[in-house]
């Protein structure tokens, strides 16, 4: 019986009493019908009634406990939700605090950087203030010096005015002297004009004389060749030596005069270029001496630039002098060759009095020699001309 009650009324943890179904009246009747011989002892005894009432009270308590348990579960769920919300709010608050802390650290760093920059600016401003103080002191000193210089200039101006007054007096005297000199110059110009007129007349007379001489030479050229041959025909053995000597005497100054004049002009040009080089050396030394003296930096830079330009000019001048010396040597060698050739030609003419072979072998040479003997000072060797043109074109480079 206890087991049946325990199974029917009490229930278990898995099957609580509120979920158990009590047997209804029909079920009890069916049960009684199934067991008709058994009397209902359970409902008749007082203990059973007490037990049923106890079970009812117990069932009520179990219901209450179940209600409390459900309420407790609801409260627990509510508390868990509130705890989750609180945790979330706490996390958000901590995140906000962390962000605020980081922002505060960043602001502190920015403030420290600004403070360091402000300190550096303060140091720079202090230095600038010190520099401005020094500048003000220097300006005051310069102001005092300028005032002193102005006073000195005023005194010098007064002295200059006195000197100017004296110079004006001298200028007045010089003007009088100038007027006198202009009068004398006018008279001298009149005399010069007279002399120029006389010179013009003399030039006119000289031209007339030259025209007459040209007419006479033309008349001599127009004479027939027989008369000229008759005039100049002489014995060959008597006239050959004088003709050669005179022609040689004429040809030697003509042939040697041009190279000698070229050599003289080259030597004069070389001397002038060497004098210019010496002058450049003196200027170079003077500029070096100026650079050694303490002075302004810009002036020293200008002097250095002048030194560089002067050094380049000296180098070019040295190259020109060396080239000119080489050409002077070549001209001398050429002159020696020409003289040797002239000597050989003259010795060949003297050694062959008949001159038949030379005339046969080189008729042009003989014709050129005879024509050169008959010319005046218009003879110029071809080699000297070529050398002169080469020297003028290529090697003499004048500085601009």
From Swiss-Prot:
Family, similarity comment: Belongs to the translokin family.
Entry function: Centrosomal protein which may be required for microtubule attachment to centrosomes.
A Pfam family hit: Cep57_MT_bd
Superkingdom classification of source: Eukaryota
Positions of modified residues (Phosphoserine): 45
Segments of this protein annotated with the region Disordered: 222-261, 314-400
Keywords per UniProt: Coiled coil, Cytoplasm, Cytoskeleton, Microtubule, Phosphoprotein
Protein name: Centrosomal protein CEP57L1
Localization per record: Cytoplasm, Cytoskeleton, Microtubule organizing center, Centrosome
Source organism of this protein record: Mus musculus (Mouse)
One GO MF term attached to the UniProt entry: identical protein binding
Primary localization: cytoplasm
Coiled-coil stretches noted in the UniProt entry, renumbered to this chain: 47-111, 138-213, 261-345
Keyword Phosphoprotein belongs to the record: yes
Ranges of biased composition (kind: Basic and acidic residues): 314-342, 391-400
GO cellular component, one term: microtubule
Record keyword Coiled coil present: yes
Ranges of compositional bias, category Polar residues: 244-258
């Amino acid at each position: 019986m206890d087991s049946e009650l325990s199974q029917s009324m009490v229930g278990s943890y898995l099957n609580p009493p509120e979920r158990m179904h009590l047997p209804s009246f029909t079920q009890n009747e069916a049960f009684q019908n199934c067991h008709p011989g058994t009397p209902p002892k359970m409902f008749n005894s007082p203990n059973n009634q007490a037990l049923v009432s106890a079970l009812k009270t117990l069932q009520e308590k179990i219901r209450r406990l179940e209600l409390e348990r459900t309420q407790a579960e609801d409260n627990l769920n509510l508390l868990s939700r509130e705890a989750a919300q609180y945790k979330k709010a706490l996390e958000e608050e901590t995140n906000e605090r962390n962000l605020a802390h980081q922002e505060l650290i960043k602001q502190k760093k920015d403030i420290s950087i600004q403070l360091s920059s402000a300190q550096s600016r303060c140091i720079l401003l202090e230095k600038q203030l010190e520099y401005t103080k020094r500048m003000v002191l220097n300006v005051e000193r310069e102001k005092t010096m300028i005032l002193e210089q102005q006073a000195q200039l005023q005194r010098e101006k007064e002295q200059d005015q006195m000197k100017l007054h004296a110079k004006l007096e001298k200028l007045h005297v010089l003007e009088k002297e100038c007027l006198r000199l202009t009068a004398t110059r006018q008279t001298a110009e009149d005399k010069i004009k007279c002399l120029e007129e006389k010179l013009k007349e003399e030039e006119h007379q000289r031209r007339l004389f030259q025209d007459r001489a040209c007419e006479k030479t033309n008349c001599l050229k127009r004479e027939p060749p027989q008369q000229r041959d008759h005039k100049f025909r002489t014995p060959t053995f008597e006239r050959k030596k004088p003709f050669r000597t005179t022609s040689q005497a004429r040809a030697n100054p003509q042939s040697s005069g041009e190279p000698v004049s070229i050599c003289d002009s080259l030597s004069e040009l070389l001397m002038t270029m060497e004098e210019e080089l010496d002058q450049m050396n003196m200027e170079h030394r003077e500029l070096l001496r100026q650079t050694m003296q303490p002075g302004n930096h810009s002036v020293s830079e200008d002097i250095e630039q002048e030194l560089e330009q002067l050094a380049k000019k000296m180098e070019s001048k040295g190259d020109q002098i060396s080239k000119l010396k080489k050409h002077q040597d070549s001209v001398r060698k050429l002159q020696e060759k020409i003289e040797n050739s002239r000597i050989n030609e003259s010795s060949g003419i003297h050694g062959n009095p008949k001159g038949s072979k030379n005339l046969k072998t080189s008729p042009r040479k003989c014709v050129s020699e005879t024509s050169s003997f008959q010319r005046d000072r218009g003879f110029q060797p071809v080699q000297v001309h070529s050398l002169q043109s080469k020297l003028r074109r290529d090697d003499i480079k004048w500085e601009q």
